[in-house]
Amino acid sequence: MHAHILGYSHGWRWIADGFALWRRAPALTSYVSFAYVLILLLASSLPYLGQIAAPLLMPILSIGVLEGMAAAEAGRRPGPEIIFAGFRAPWRSLALLGAFQLVGNLFAVLATVLVDGGLLLGLYRGTIDPASLESEPQLLWPLLVWLAVALPVTMAYWFAPALLAWYRQPWIKALFFSFYAMLRNWRPFLVYALGLTVLAFVLAFALSLLAALIHPYVLGIALFLLPLVLVPTLFAGLYLQVRDVFGPR
């Protein structure tokens, strides 16, 4: 399995070209993106099983998103069943990837408990008031511990569903090659993360300015409309990352 090593400029191109792909096929890219989000939200709301079902479904449904983005790039118009394309792949192995991510994230949270006695977990669950921690310097250490565990898990998972379903890699190798590819391509991913951060700040500033100059309702309308563009753009960017790093399937 070969992973291309890309330059810094690809990080911004994934954002710009992702937006261009959405503009080319807004209906299809929006459908697969929001169907993915909606199904996972519904799965997570299931009593007792939701917190397990959603992570297991995540890699399976992500293949449907990638297939939809590939169809949009090729100019094809697939049916609505494309979101379930992952079930035509080795879906049991895909579910194992979801289990890996679930266990890895749980381990990251448990690791923070060893450092702060459950402070960060309490913030996440809403049992601790964030206002009471404004001057809490110890919050930095559990965050660093969480990042030290969660980042490698995310790197191993990032490309793994595509490597398994599109490039026919066993799930263990898919996790390894995903981590390897992310590590070798830290430069464009750094630019990608910084680009998204800058974009978020610029949009937040622009929306606040518009709300102050025109009408506060403008902010509400914009907050409703922006995800309709940004969410498909981000998913399209993920497809472009797979294509650029690993080449045509």
Regions found by a protein language model. Name each.
Residues M1-R249:
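Hydrophobic alpha-helical membrane segments
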